[in-house]
Each structure stands twice: as structure tokens, then as C-alpha cells.
From Swiss-Prot:
It comes from Pseudotsuga menziesii (Douglas-fir). The keyword Protein transport does not apply. Molecular chaperone. Has ATPase activity. Keywords: ATP-binding, Chaperone, Nucleotide-binding, Stress response. Signal peptide: none annotated. Belongs to the heat shock protein 90 family. This is Putative heat shock protein 1. One of its GO terms (molecular function) is ATP binding. It comes from the Eukaryota.
């Protein structure tokens, strides 16, 4: 779950 959240955050920043 944490990994998924981090990936989402990075995608949003990108």
C-alpha cells in the first residue's frame, strides 16, 4: 500500500 501511495505521489509530481 505504501509503495502504491508513493508511486501515485511521484506520478502526480511528474
Amino acid at each position: 500500500e505504501l509503495v502504491s501511495n508513493a508511486s501515485d505521489a511521484l506520478d502526480k509530481l511528474r
